[in-house]
Amino acid sequence: MEQERVKKALERFRNHVISQSKRNLTRTQKNSSKKLYNSIKGDLKVHQNSFTLEFSMEDYGVYQDAGVSGVKKKYNTPYSYKSKMPPSKAFDKWITRKGLAPRDSGGKFSKRKSLSFLIARSVYRNGIKPSLFFTKPFEAAYKNLPEELIEEYGLDAIELFNEQIDTILENG
C-alpha cells in the first residue's frame, strides 16, 4: 500500500476518533469545563516502513472512559477506589459551573463544602460509570480501516488500543 494512501487512511481514522470522542463527551454531558474536550489530540507520523499514531488527552479522561469501581458498586474496569475518597475540593468548581445551590430543610442555602463532601462520598461508594466516549469511536473507526492496511502493518485493535491508553497515562 503506497505511503500517501496509508497517510490519508490514518488521518481519516484519527480525525474520526477525535471528532466522535468529542461528540460523545458533549452528548453524555461530561464536558462542563471543556478541559478534557480541548485536550483530545492525535499525532500521526508516517515513516518508510512504519507509522506512529498517538492519541493524548487529560489524565482523568482515561478514568472517564473506562470508569472506576466504587467500594459498593463495581464496574468491569481495572480502576477502583479502595481506601481513599476523591478529594472533595475537586468537586467545588464543578458545583459552581453546574449552578448547584444546595438548600437545607428550612430553605436556607447550605455550604458548598458540604455538598462537595457528599458528592465525593457518593463517587467513592458508587464509582464512575464507564462512558466509553473514546473506546467506542476508536473501535468503530478501526473496523473501517482498509483491510490491506491492517494486513500489511499487522494491526491488532486490542493491542493498539492498550498502547494508546498506556501512552496517555505515561505522558499525562
Regions found by a protein language model. Name each.
Residues 1-46, 50-52:
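Charge-rich, low-complexity N-terminal segments
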